[in-house]
Amino acid sequence: EMATKLVAARLLTAEAARAKESGQRADMLSGMAKLFASETAKEVCEDALRIHGGYGYINEFMVERLYREAPLYIVGEGTNDIQKIVIARRIIDDSEVDVLGLPQ
């Protein structure tokens, strides 16, 4: 489950980068990638800490640092609440955006 979430976060980030590099508007995809990847990082770090048990809190284990730093990704470069607003505005304002792949 943890690996699946991490791969999905990487793929979404790569798709946002591909859109940006090809000159397409990438604000929505970038916001989605940041939102999903930062939430995933926090969830995966929490799971890793549980797996390590008490050792997860010891500075000698990398999971302690990752667990401590993961919430910072949610705040950096615009909080996830701001990312949700960016995504929603793009979907509402642009009729060309077809997020679900449904006929319009």
Q: Where on the chain are the PLM-derived regions?
A:
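Alpha-helical interface subdomain recognition
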Residues: 1-104
